Amino acid sequence: MWKKYKTTLILTTLISLFPMVIGLLLWNRMPDTIATHFGTNNVPNGWSSKTMAVIGIPLFLAALQIFTAVLTFSDPKRQNIGPKMIRLVLWIIPVTSLIVCCSIYANAVGIAVDIGFVSNGIVGLLFILIGNYMPKCKQNYTTGIKVPWTLHSQENWNRTHRLAGWVWIIGGVAMIVNSFLQLEWILFLTIAALVLIPIGRASCRERV
């Protein structure tokens, strides 16, 4: 598996680092302290040094990309992880790195960016993509709803992931709608539903 996806892993890791190049080109135009976290209504509530924003964040995301790949490729049941799911896993972080870092840099140089719209929209699309693949996901230890009940029973795994697929797609639509509304309670409720409903289904199915 390493050999098969070696080129993709190298490419996606370099893409995760690419915002560093953009940040260095904009270095002299950015202040020494940069807003890197935003609350509702695009109000900054977290700041980082320019060095951390330009170099630290892309380095962290590139390291996370490699760590995620190692986990995926080392899974004892990696043969059950389909090619589409592996490509999705390998491309999530680099695409996120590009969009998030470029939004931060744009805001730092005075270009108005609706961070709430961008972040909710990205998360929503990601949830929909994951939800689409959930029912096709076979038992493994890296992706999917990995709780004792689903790992113990193939039938439980299949039923839970069919339900989870719909839940995640609906959650993704809710997040896209929330990119316009930007309400915190929708975010928290959606994430809670995405986690608790599939786990609850797996638990109840095991007890039946």
Can you say where each PLM-predicted feature lies in the sequence?
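Active-site and channel-lining beta-strand-loop segments
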Residues: 23-55, 143-152
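Membrane-helix boundary/juxtamembrane motif in polytopic membrane proteins
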Residues: 143-167
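Small-residue-rich transmembrane alpha-helices that serve as helix-helix interface/gating elements
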Residues: 122, 185-200
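Ordered, amphipathic secondary-structure segments that act as subunit-interaction surfaces
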Residues: 69-117
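Residue-level detector of conserved catalytic or cofactor/ligand-binding positions
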Residues: 198-208
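Select subsegments of transmembrane alpha-helices in polytopic membrane proteins
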Residues: 8-11, 54-60, 87-95, 158-169
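Alpha-helical transmembrane segments
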Residues: 12, 46-61, 114-130
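Membrane-water interface of transmembrane alpha-helices
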Residues: 25-30, 62-74, 129-144, 203-205
